[in-house]
């Protein structure tokens, strides 16, 4: 029985979950909320590093901005992808206007940009809006 570390999307506590329990709707040991809600996690400067480095599952981050038309168009597709991919993959969003330092750190030049992280390391990136099927296909091809 292997154990996975999963960061809570609500309180950001790290939870140890047996891998066979992932599909059984596990809850956070600290705040008691569901670890997987079927929605992308909103990241901030204080929670970003915790999620990309402490989760044992891959984390896909959508770097976006409120003024970006393609970002707004892709948001529902990204949310649909979260429903399909959880709990094997965590989908998250980072507002580049509010977190300019992180956007600069990862050299985000166009938005939306998706980056797949595993163990804090970037595995792949894709710029431009995509459909839910394209997002799922792209993620599955890299994890």
Role assignments for model-derived ranges:
Residues 110, 115-143:
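Non-catalytic, surface beta->alpha helical segment in thiol-disulfide oxidoreductase systems
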